[in-house]
Amino acid sequence: MSTLGTSYYAEASVLSEQDEIAPRYPSAAGVEQTMLTEYGGHESCPLQGKSTLFAGSWSPITTHPPNPGAPTYIHHHYTSGDSDGMFTRSWALDPASLCLTGLPSATMHYEIKPEPLIGSAECTPLETHTPLLSDIGNDATIAKIPCESTSTDKALKGDKTAEETRERDANNPSSNWLHAKPTRKKRCPYTKHQILELEKEFLFNMYLPRDRRYEVARLLHLTERQVKIWFQNRRMKMKKENKDRRRDS
């Protein structure tokens, strides 16, 4: 009986509460709807991604086309949270995460002139490379680099030396009769001993026979043609001397 009494009392209390709620709220569906909307029951709660969760710590950097007139500057909003501050520092220290388009670079690059090629006719009077700011700050002197001689200059110098030697040979009487002009065939000079022996033979006989020419050539270490030519020239010289004597007389 005690259990029945307690259950009856519970049901009566529940019914009395429902009777009190009924005049305030017209229907149970309305009560459920208001309760759900108040505490967010069936409303859709989409999960936020990592990018939206940390959107307050850093903002996405947008790339702008570089403006040659004025450099663009980017301002980042950072929060003061401890956990967000860790991400802020890590992202701020990462140089790859920043877009440096349009920002003036800290280091200035200077163009370097190419060095002239060896053998070329052109040569710059100044140094082959532009001085750096550090060199200018240290009062470094700019030295001139001498121009290397080209192949054409070397050829001209060689021609000049050859012409000078030819002029010396032409002015020197002792070497003029030994060396002929470069256009003609080079003569074969005879030694003093050879000339003396040929002169003796010429005094005995102006016209040597063939056998005697071979014998003289063998004794003087000459060829038969050389002995023959020498005798021909010697006869022409003797005739010229005779003509000159007749004119003088």
Curated annotation (Swiss-Prot):
Basic and acidic residues: bias regions: 154-170
CDD domains (UniProt xref): homeodomain
InterPro entries named among the record's database cross-references: Abd-B_homeobox_TF, HD, HD_metazoa, Homeobox_CS, Homeodomain-like_sf, Hox9_activation_N, HXA9/HXB9/HXC9
DNA-binding region, residues: 183-242
SUPFAM superfamilies: Homeodomain-like
Gene Ontology BP annotations: anterior/posterior pattern specification; DNA-templated transcription; embryonic skeletal system morphogenesis; proximal/distal pattern formation
Region (Disordered): 152-183
Subcellular localization(s) per the UniProt record: Nucleus
Keywords: Developmental protein, DNA-binding, Homeobox, Nucleus, Transcription, Transcription regulation
UniProt keyword Transcription, yes or no: yes
Pfam families, per the entry: Homeodomain (PF00046), Hox9_act (PF04617)
Major subcellular site: nucleus
A GO cellular-component term linked to this record: nucleus
GO MF terms, alphabetically ordered: DNA-binding transcription factor activity, RNA polymerase II-specific; RNA polymerase II cis-regulatory region sequence-specific DNA binding
Job of this protein: Sequence-specific transcription factor which is part of a developmental regulatory system that provides cells with specific positional identities on the anterior-posterior axis.
Family in the record: Belongs to the Abd-B homeobox family.
Name the record gives this protein: Homeobox protein Hox-A9b
Organism annotation: Takifugu rubripes
Organism ancestry: Eukaryota, Metazoa, Chordata, Craniata, Vertebrata
Gene this chain is encoded by: hoxa9b
